[in-house]
C-alpha cells in the first residue's frame, strides 16, 4: 500500500480536483441531449448559450392576453383587493377554527367590500364565474371551495333544480351571503351511488309538509361543506316518499332535492330535529367547515321541494314532464355538472401556480458547472427539463381544454340543447377526472424539483398538494367518472354500427373509424423526420388511432365476457381496459383543442411558443405510451427512437421560453406567495421569512 502511494503521489488539492471533475462528468449526463461532453469542449456553456441566442423572442403581453381572455379585469380586481388587505391573507400557520373564520371573512370581504358578486354569473355568465373561482382559489383554495359550496352547489341547486318561486325567494339572500347554505348529498354509506341514498322526505298531506328523516346511521349526511359552522340552509337530497291507496301504503319516487333550514336566521342556533356534528380536521381545505347532518322528523313546507323536474300537489299527486325515475334522476344530476366543470378549471389554476413556483425557482437556482466557469441554472439540466417542461406543456394543454369545456357548458346553459347536455356531461366527467389526477401527481413532482426548499411550508407545495388532493374524489370519484366516459364511448360505438350518428365531441370516431382500425401503413410507420413528427395531423391521427383501437378491443372483450359473467361481471373484468380507453379519448380531445388554440393564436411569436409546447405535449404522450403503438406496428423502432430524441430536444427548446410561458399566467408574487419564486431578490426575501 505504501509503495503504491509513493508511485502515484497526489496532493490534497489534486485529489479534490479529481473528485470534482468526476462529479461534473456524472452531472453532465443530466444535461440537454445536445450537450455531449467532449474533451475539447466545455461541458455546459457552449450549446446552452448558442441555443439561448437563437431562442424565440416571445411577445409576453400578447401571449398573456390570448391565454387569459376577456376576464383579466375581474381577476386583477380580486388579486388587488386581497393584496390591499393583509388581514385577509391566509398565514402559513393557522388553526382549523381560525382558518374557518378567516375563510368566511374573506368571502364576505370579496362580496360586500370588493363588490365581486359571483352568484350573478353562475347561470348567466359561467365563463366569468369560473374566472372568478380561479382567481379566488389562487388566494386560498379553501376560499375557492367555500365560494363554490355557497354559489355553485347550494345556490346552483336552487336556481337549477328549483323554479321561479325559489329563485325569487332565495336569490338575493344567497347572493349577499345572508342565506349561507350547504349541498347535502353525500351520506356515510353512499357517495358515488347517489341513487342509493337513504334519507327520506315523506309527504304529509294533512299538514301539506314533507318530513325529512335519517333512517339509520348510514344515511347521515357526511362531508357537507358549510354545515359545521356557517350554513343556515341545506339542499338535502332525499328519497321522495308519497302515500298511496294500495296495499303498499307508500311509493318511492326516487331521489329529489329539498330546501331544509338547519339553523335559526337570528340566533344561528341549530333548529329542532336537526343534529350537526363537525367532521373535524382534514388533510387539507381546513378553511372549509365540513359537517355531518342527521334529521329527526324535520318538517318543511311542500314548497321547499325543488320542483323543476317533479312536483307534488296539495293532495299528494306527483307530476313530472319526465316519464321515469331514471330520466328525472339524470336530468337532476345533469343540472349539477357545473361543479365538475369548476373543479377541472380550478385544478388547472393550481397547476399554473405550482408550475410557476417550480420553474421560477429552477431558473433562479444555480448548482455546479464546468471547471473554472460559473454555475448553471438547474433548469439547464436535462433531468430537470424532463420533470418540468412536459408538465408546463400539459398545463397549457389543459388550460385550452378546460376553456373549451367552459364554453360548451355556457352554451348548454343558454340553449338547453339535449344533445349538448349529454356531450358536456361526458366531457366534464372526463376532464375533471383526468386533469385533477394529473395535477395531484404534478404537485409532488414540483415539490421534488425544488429540493429541500420545496419542503418549506412557506413555499406552498405542501398546502397546495393537501388542498388539491380531494379534487380527485369530490364531485365524483375519478375512477367512477372515467367509467362514465367509457360507457358513453361504447354507446356511441354501438350507435355507429347500428346506423346512428355521433355527437360533435366524438366526431372523429364517425369520420374515420374505418381508417383508424385498418392496418398501419408500413411506410409512414417508419417516417422519422422532424417535420413529419411535428405535423399536427400525424399527432392527432396517432391519438385517434389509439382510442379507436382501444374502443374496438374493449367492445370485443365485453361481448366475450358478458356471455359467461353477465353485464356487471364483464364490466368489472374489463375495468382497467375501460379506464385506459377513457383516458386515451380525453387525451385526444385535449390535443385537438390545443392544436386548434395554436392555429387561432393571432400573434406570430406567441403562436410559435404555443406550437413548441403543443408538439412537446403530443410527442411526450405518444412516447409514454409507445408500447401500444409498437405492439400494432403503428410506429417502427427507428421512429420510436426519433420520437424520444425529439421529445428531449423540444423539452430543451421549451426550457428556453419557460420564463415567458409561466409569466403569461400573470401570477404576481403576492398571489404565488412563495419566497423561492419571487421575481426579485428571492433569496433575500426567503431569508427574511425565517428571521434574518
Curated annotation (Swiss-Prot):
GO MF assignments: acyl-CoA oxidase activity; FAD binding; fatty acid binding
Transit sequence range: 1-49
Catalysed reactions listed for this entry: a 2,3-saturated acyl-CoA + O2 = a (2E)-enoyl-CoA + H2O2
InterPro entries: ACO, ACOX_C_alpha1, Acyl-CoA_Oxase/DH_mid-dom, Acyl-CoA_Oxase/DH_mid-dom_sf, Acyl-CoA_oxidase, Acyl-CoA_oxidase_C, AcylCo_DH-like_C, AcylCoA_DH/oxidase_NM_dom_sf
Subcellular localization(s) per the UniProt record: Peroxisome
Enzyme Commission no: 1.3.3.6
Residues binding FAD: 186, 192, 225, 365, 384, 452, 473, 477
A Pfam family it matches: Acyl-CoA_dh_M
Membrane-spanning residues: none
Assembly description: Homodimer.
Name of the protein described by the UniProt record: Acyl-coenzyme A oxidase 2, peroxisomal
UniProt organism field: Arabidopsis thaliana (Mouse-ear cress)
